[in-house]
Structures are given as C-alpha cells and as structure tokens.
Amino acid sequence: MLHSNIYNLQAEATNKILSSSSLEELESIKLYYFGKSGTITACLKSIATISNIEERKSVGSSVNAICAELKSLINSQKEKLHKIQINAQLMQDRVDISLPVRPKQIAKLHPISKTLHEVRHIFSSLGFKLSDGPELEDEFHVFDALNTHKNHPAREENDTFYLKTLVNQKRVVLRTHTSSVQIRVMQANKGNYPIKIIAPGKVYRNDWDATHSPMFHQIEGLYIDKNVNMGHLKYCIHYFLKKFFGENIQIRFRNSYFPFTEPSAEVDIKCGEKDWIEILGCGMVHRNVLTNVNIDPDQYSGFAFGIGIERVAMLKYNISDLRKFYSNKLQWLNHYGFCFTHLVSC
C-alpha cells in the first residue's frame, strides 16, 4: 500500500515541479511535499510502523531514492526559473546610455613616493644598486665608524633619539642618516669592487618645524673603487640635479665639513635671481671611514652623498611646509598628489 502511494506521489510531484512557472510556486510545491507536514514527509514517518524488517528496508530504500530524485529535480527547476527571472528583469531594466557616468575617486601617489621613485630611477641609470639597512642602529654604525667624535653635537640627546635600554650592551639609536647603510655594505664587501649603491630610507632627528621633521626620508649614495676622485662626484651630482630639476638648473659647490668625508661640500641650486638654496651634502669618503671597515685607503677611494627627499620634493613641487607631507589631509593630497601614470619606468 505504501509502495504504490509513494510512486503516485512521485508522479504527481514531478508533474507539478516541471509545470511550475515561478520560484514562489516552486517553493510552495517543495513545502507541500517536504515540509514538516508534507505528504512525502508523512510517508517517511510511516515507514517506522512497518513490522516486517525486510519490507521496512525495501520501502525505506525506495522512499529515500524517490526523495533524492525529487529534490534534485526541484534544484534543477529552481536554476531554470532563476535564469528566466533574471533575463526578464534585464529586458525590463533598460540602461539610458545618454546619462553621465558617476564620478570616481581615483587614488593619487604621494609626492614623497613619487620623488623616491624618480631619484632611484635617475641613479639606477648611472649603475647604482639599491641597498637597505635597519632603522634601529648601534652607535658604531651611526657615529663611530663614520669618524664622528664622542663629543660631536650630533650625538647629543637633544638631537638624536636614543633607546633607554641597551642591546647587546650597546647604546641603540634611531638612525640619524642612511650613512649607516654604507658602513654595513662596506663591511659585508668581500673584495668585490666597485661598490656603487644608493640607500633610501627613513631617518630620525629631534626637530620639528616648517622645514624639519622628527622623521624624514634620505637617500645615501656611495661609490668606492680605485682612482675615484672629486671629478666623478661632481659629474654624478650634476647629472642627478639636471635630470631631476631640469637642464637649465644652476648648481654650485661650497666647501663644508662633515666628519665622514674629506674634502666635503654642500651643493646649492639657484632659485630666482639671487637666492641659492642648499640641496645636499657630499664629499670624498674619509680615510678613517675606509680604515674602520677594513678597506685600504691607499688602494681605494670613493665619494658619498646624502639627499633629503622632502627637501628636493618641496623645491620641485613648490611645497612650503614640510609638515604637510604627514598631515593625512585628502584635500592636500588631491592637490599635490600624482597619477600613477606619471611614474617613470625603471
């Protein structure tokens, strides 16, 4: 009796499922047969009342197979009706192609990122390789190896950020320049020359005003080989500044003093009719620095330079206040930022 009843229900349900014309109708059919009070659900419950074990197994197997077949049919019909519904909706929802597009907010490249990319590109065209080093450094790499005397003002706590705790029994500082990277590069060198690197990165000094920031970006350059002289340095600096600011830029070198270079120079560019603005520091690597990293100063020589990224960006893009770089104001970035298509390819 149960066998014939379930097969009749199968035929009836199959016919209703295939003839359903909407998702709502299909859902009501599903509930009618498989809901808590559904007709097929009732058949499943009645299997437990069959006393003969073999018959109960046979009927149960048949009912489960029919249930699986009907549920598969419901899912198939559901997909079919869903596609029909979407197609009908697409036909109704016509798009007016004459309407203007919605405005899109396009991200812009920060001036510092743009400047870093451009400076790296210029020096890579001269054969300089990219190097990096830790921002948290010991005094040897930041000061001692760079021929900076124990009483030098740069080592005072009002100029430099020192950690209170010692690391391996050494005082640790937030690096004040990326010159520490040149020390690590020369220490790691195993007689492979030339050493020709640039080291961009963040540096830290205890200063904060319109032209100074406690954290800023610097690029260190280093070239070590036999017979390197001041002429090589001047050519390199001239090449960079003319590529960065334009061929018509006027450049001058002034004598200066840095403990890690001898001779040392500061480089200015002309702004307006009379004004000269310092742009970077440079010089020939001091003999003591080469000796500190086990390079024979009688065999090898070289030059180094340091460029403040914020400084050259302010001059090139006419930005008056360095602190604006870190203000996180969207209006400022929209004004001074760059489209990514402005990046030169490296």
Curated annotation (Swiss-Prot):
Tetramer of two alpha and two beta subunits. The gene is pheS. Its cofactor is Mg(2+). Belongs to the class-II aminoacyl-tRNA synthetase family. Phe-tRNA synthetase alpha subunit type 1 subfamily. Mg(2+) binds at E262. It catalyses: tRNA(Phe) + L-phenylalanine + ATP = L-phenylalanyl-tRNA(Phe) + AMP + diphosphate + H(+). GO terms for biological process: phenylalanyl-tRNA aminoacylation. Its main location: cytoplasm. One of its GO terms (cellular component) is cytoplasm. PROSITE patterns: AA_TRNA_LIGASE_II (PS50862). Binds 2 magnesium ions per tetramer. Keywords: Aminoacyl-tRNA synthetase, ATP-binding, Cytoplasm, Ligase, Magnesium, Metal-binding, Nucleotide-binding, Protein biosynthesis. It is found in: Cytoplasm. It comes from the Bacteria. It is an enzyme of class 6 (ligase). This is Phenylalanine--tRNA ligase alpha subunit. Pfam families: Phe_tRNA-synt_N (PF02912), tRNA-synt_2d (PF01409). One of its GO terms (molecular function) is tRNA binding. SUPFAM superfamilies: Class II aaRS and biotin synthetases, tRNA-binding arm. Its EC number is 6.1.1.20. Gene3D superfamilies: Bira Bifunctional Protein, Domain 2.
